[in-house]
Amino acid sequence: VKGYFSASGRFRSDDMKTSNVLAFVGSSAGCTFFPDHVTRSDEESYPIEIKTYPAPKFEGGGDYAVQQGAGMVVIRKSDEQVEAAARFLKWFTQSDWAIEFSVTSGYLPVTAEDNDMVKIEKDSPSMKKNVRDSLGTAVQVVRQNTLYTSKAFKNGMSARKKLEYAMSDAAKADRQRVVEAIENGATQEAAVAAFVSEERFDAWYAQLMDELNELAAQ
């Protein structure tokens, strides 16, 4: 609403590569896409250093963190195919390979035992700094929080999309009204006042909950 947020590339790491943003919120899996240089033009680029932080918590809130990632399932097939899939999953989650996959992809290892930075660094001493920093932060979050993942339910994908875009869509619409007010002579402070208040947030939240409840009732 104040003009400090931007999302023009496909991913926020793309916006960082072009100096369009200074910081972004992303998953640990995004660390493999972190740029080490910012390119402003064909003639100008410069190196950057990246710091990763745990997701913030609400004041007074509990120690919870959202966990999600790529899932694997075995669908109903022949006994031979089911056994082959089970063998693959068992191999895929074994310690040595799980850590190797984690380092190359940014995803965390499957087992609690393997979520150990001493073990990860010992097995992969040459991993990139961005990956090391991101995995270190992610492992810290796993060990210091109770993990939560959303359950599957009817219209769950629609609800997820609504949650993904509800705030950004509202902010874009409000920002447009702020720009129009400034063009008509209002100050920045006066133009944004009505859109950054507790009342505006409460109204947005109430509307969002109504829309989610409507989806859940279908």
Regions found by a protein language model. Name each.
Residues 65-68, 89, 99-101, 128:
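Glycine-enriched catalytic-core subsegment of oxygenase/oxidase enzymes
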Residues 12, 30, 81-85, 97, ...:
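Stable alpha-helical elements in mature extracytoplasmic
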Residues 139-218:
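Conserved C-terminal helix/tail region of periplasmic/extracytoplasmic solute-binding proteins
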Residues 1-87:
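Extracytoplasmic/periplasmic substrate-binding proteins
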Residues 113-148:
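An extracytoplasmic/periplasmic, membrane-proximal ligand-sensing/linker region
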Residues 1-3, 20, 28, 35-38, ...:
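Sec/Tat-exported extracytoplasmic proteins
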Residues 91-117:
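Periplasmic-binding protein-like
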Residues 76-77, 119, 150-154:
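Short, contiguous acidic/charged loop-to-helix segments that flank catalytic cores in large enzymes
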